[in-house]
Curated annotation (Swiss-Prot):
Protein's GO biological process: diterpenoid biosynthetic process
One Pfam short name: Terpene_synth
Signal peptide region: none
Cytoplasm recorded as keyword: yes
Entry's Gene Ontology molecular function annotations: magnesium ion binding; terpene synthase activity
Residues annotated to bind Mg(2+) 2: D356, D360
Protein name: Putative terpenoid synthase 7
Keywords: Cytoplasm, Lyase, Magnesium, Manganese, Metal-binding
Chief location category: cytoplasm
EC id: 4.2.3.-
GO cellular component: cytoplasm
Binding-site positions, Mg(2+) 1: D356, D360
Originating gene: TPS07
């Protein structure tokens, strides 16, 4: 019997699972027919229901928008991995790691502590921080106790900005007052700063970690943005710095996915005159190992996805996005050794996306209610036997997937995490049916009414539950209780997710007659144009980002890794929605990002 290799949390360890039982294993397999993107534009198709129904609309014609299948799914089947290359990379990494660790921890004294923090910034930017978590924690804890002494007399814009960025990035509430020294007598930032391109860029990056109370950082963001655009366009900066400035203006490092940063930063660092050759090599080795690990997982996942047989069992209303799921999950589970967490989360996201598409894109209200009722009971309701085959398939897939989670986590005494996640999944289903009732009636509620339901339907709560479940023993019962309490951090993440989804998905919604969204609700309630609604909703997203930063810094009594996972989910959203609705339409920047991770392997 063929064996499938899956890597688990300890770097280099493996477990072999038989193909008949699949990933965890899965008790039932369904398959998928792979096709490429069509050359013609999207079109509406009309599909006649063929299953026996008891409703009056038995012979009704459904109208829905067929989405193109993903070109990436086919790519996953063609992947070839050289395991010996991965082993060789691990050996080189293991040899270099203690040398770099010694370098990081060898700095002593106040000035040397600054150098250590600047090196931490390099480690984060080069994608290496996960190798040195204990050393970074020890350094920042010790340094923050002497922060005033360390910052006293420091007048280099780059140094101050990077130190500020590193501390806030790791949850230390360093005061924005450190930037007061760069203001002139008129209360504005000194114009002389504009001659320091790297300093201006670092100040811009630091300003993106501002809270609702950091007014000086809002000024810094405005000041740096306009001048950096001019610097990048003027040709006075080195070309590699101009590229980095333009990338940062498009998406700041703070809101970028951690594993995407080194895609741009490694080439930048290599062109820096004073780069460290050993650190650069270590970054390339580590990134290459991550790429190969991801590809190995994709080969397994695309095989599993093909065997799910969605195309045979479902009308073509669902988003075929298994590889896109893997890419986005990397936002939370980045390091190569977290293979188990990624795979479990991808299975979970597949169920969430199928649920959303079924409610949002295809099911009649009768069918949607039956599915929601069955999920609430966590078993088929009486009406389910009379529902179309496709709907029973959706329900069975969801129930079977969670049963496999229980089988996987039960021996670890973590069934509570599956049960808690099920409850969040049910809440998402209920919110879906509430929105569906409005949508099918073409009802546009008040903005407040819509957001109350929409913040749950956008599945932030359900996604975080799945993330916590996938973490294994790290996420205790208290983690799920914290999520259940709906803390402010998570509430504002839901606001951000709901609005970004509706802003970027607005044209898609309207093209299929789906009028119940935040834009239309805001337009109706406040009597404004679409353009005005977009502008005001974007302001709410910006304000939500500041609150996220604030809550990340001020929340106490919650493990740091849970707070980081929440912010990482925010980063996933930012990348997915930065230019368009990147999950539904994975073109443009999303395609560039995925190509850099899965196709263009780094040269060492």
């Amino acid at each position: 019997m063929e064996a499938t290799s899956v890597f688990w949390p300890k770097l280099g360890s493996q477990i072999f699972l038989s193909s008949s039982t699949n990933l965890w294993p899965l008790s039932k397999l369904y398959g998928f027919h792979l096709t490429s993107f069509p050359s013609k534009p999207l079109k509406h198709i009309r599909l006649k229901a063929t299953n026996t129904l008891t409703f009056d609309d038995q012979e009704r014609i459904r109208k829905f928008k067929k989405l193109p299948t993903s070109e990436w799914t086919h790519y996953g089947h063609s992947i070839s991995i050289d395991v010996s290359e991965m082993d060789a990379l691990r050996k080189e990494i293991d040899a270099l790691k203690p040398i770099l660790k010694s370098t990081l921890m060898s700095f002593k004294g106040i000035d040397s502590t600054k150098k250590r923090i600047l090196m931490i910034y390099l480690l984060v930017s080069l994608g290496l921080a996960y190798h040195f978590e204990e050393e970074i924690y020890e350094t920042l804890k010790m340094s923050f106790e002497n922060i005033d002494k360390m910052m006293d007399g420091e007048d280099d814009l780059y140094t101050v900005s990077i130190i500020f960025w590193v501390f806030r990035r790791h949850g230390y509430h360093i005061s924005y007052g450190v930037f007061q020294r760069f203001k002139g007598s008129n209360g504005n930032f000194k114009e002389s700063l504009t001659r320091d391109a790297k300093g201006m860029l670092s100040l811009y990056e630091a300003a993106n970690l501002g809270t609702t109370k950091d007014f000086i950082l809002e000024e810094a963001l405005s000041f740096t943005s306009s001048h950096l655009e001019s610097l990048a366009a003027s040709g006075t900066c080195p070309p590699h710095l101009s590229v980095r400035i333009r990338n940062a203006l498009g998406l700041s490092q703070h809101w970028n996915m951690e594993m995407l940063v080194p895609v741009e930063f490694i080439p930048f660092y290599e062109q820096e005159i004073e780069h460290d050759e050993m650190l650069l090599k270590f970054a390339k080795l580590s990134f290459k190992l991550g790429q190969l690990q991801y590809l190995q997982e994709l080969k397994t996942l695309t095989k599993w996805y093909k065997e799910l047989d969605f195309a045979t069992n479902l009308p073509p209303y669902f988003r075929d996005r298994i590889v896109e799921h893997h890419f986005l999950v990397q936002a939370v589970f980045f390091s190569p050794q977290l293979s188990r967490e990624r795979i479990m989360m991808i299975q979970y996201f597949t169920g969430l996306a199928l649920l959303d598409d079924t409610f949002d894109r295809y099911a009649s209200l009768h069918e949607a209610e039956s599915l929601a009722n069955s999920l609430e009971r966590w078993a088929p309701d009486q009406a389910m036997d009379k529902q179309p085959d496709y709907l029973r398939f959706v329900l069975n897939f969801i129930l079977d997937t969670f049963e496999e989670f229980k089988r996987e986590l039960g021996p670890e005494e973590r069934s509570y995490s599956v049960n808690a996640t099920i409850e969040e999944f049910k809440a998402a289903a209920k919110a879906n049916i509430d929105l569906e009732k409005w949508a099918q009636a073409d009802h546009i509620p008040s903005f407040e009414e819509y957001m109350e339901v929409g913040e749950v339907e956008v599945t932030v709560y359900a996604s975080l539950a799945g993330i916590f479940m996938s973490m294994g023993k790290m996420a205790t019962k208290e983690a799920f209780e914290w999520l259940k309490s709906r803390p402010k951090l998570v509430q504002y993440l839901s606001i951000k997710g709901r609005l970004m989804n509706d802003l970027m998905g607005y044209e898609d919604d309207m093209s299929r007659g789906y009028v119940t969204n935040a834009v239309n609700c805001y337009m109706k309630q406040y009597g404004v144009t679409k353009e005005e609604a977009f502008r005001e909703l974007y302001k709410i997203v910006v304000a939500a980002n500041k609150t996220l930063n604030e809550e990340f810094l001020s929340t106490t009594g919650v493990p740091h890794f849970l707070l980081k996972a929440t912010i990482d989910l925010a980063r996933m959203m930012t990348v997915a929605y930065n230019v368009n609705e990147g999950f539904t339409n994975p073109q443009g920047k999303i395609k560039e990002y995925m190509t850099s991770m899965f196709v263009d392997q780094i040269h060492i």
